[in-house]
Regions:
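A beta-strand edge to alpha-helix "cap/lid" segment located at domain peripheries
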Residues: 76, 88, 119-123
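Conserved S-adenosyl-L-methionine
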Residues: 32-34, 94-97
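Short, small/polar residue-rich loop motifs at catalytic or cofactor-binding pockets
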Residues: 100-102
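Conserved short beta-strand elements that form part of the metal-binding/catalytic scaffold
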Residues: 29-67, 108, 114-121
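Mid-chain, well-packed structural core segment of small domains
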Residues: 71-83
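Core segments of cupin and vicinal oxygen chelate
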Residues: 2-3, 10-52, 88
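Short hydrophobic/aromatic beta-strand element in the GNAT-like acyltransferase core
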Residues: 42, 73, 93, 104-106, ...
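N-terminal beta-strand motif that seeds the catalytic metal site of vicinal oxygen chelate
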Residues: 1-19, 69-72, 121-126
Length: 126
């Protein structure tokens, strides 16, 4: 089987505020923003270089409360550079956490959903 994750729903309270954060602060691409009906708005945002997107919106039918996602983990090339870029854009992010299995930067979106950004270790170094 060949499976690829396409979309992760991220529960938010204010769609416009969340969209601005993800696009302006984190550099996500705004792929789609459509008000389908009065009750339904679907916004798809994709991290640069990712084949998987997130969806935020209104009336999407999810049962998760805004801010309840405890960890969404993505891979980044350089934890130090990403941390510096985030802080330069005013994003509150924790400093680099060094672990044997990678280097991590943690942040929260305006609703409190937690993102962990992981720089993978250089396994070729032996």
């Amino acid at each position: 089987m060949d499976w690829k994750i396409e979309l992760i729903f991220v529960p938010v309270t204010d769609v416009d505020r969340a969209k601005e954060f993800y696009v302006e602060k984190l550099g996500f691409n705004a792929d789609f923003d459509q008000r389908v009906t009065e009750e339904l708005r679907f916004v798809q945002l994709t991290p640069p270089g990712s084949a998987c997107s997130i969806a935020i919106g209104e009336g999407l039918g999810g049962t998760l409360a805004p801010g309840s996602l405890d960890v969404i983990q993505v891979v980044i090339p350089d934890a130090d550079a990403v941390l510096a870029e985030l802080r330069a854009k005013g994003v509150e992010a924790e400093g680099v956490d060094e672990q044997p299995w990678g280097r991590f930067v943690t942040l929260r979106d305006p609703d409190g959903n937690r993102w962990t950004l992981q720089q993978l270790p250089d396994y070729s170094a032996g």
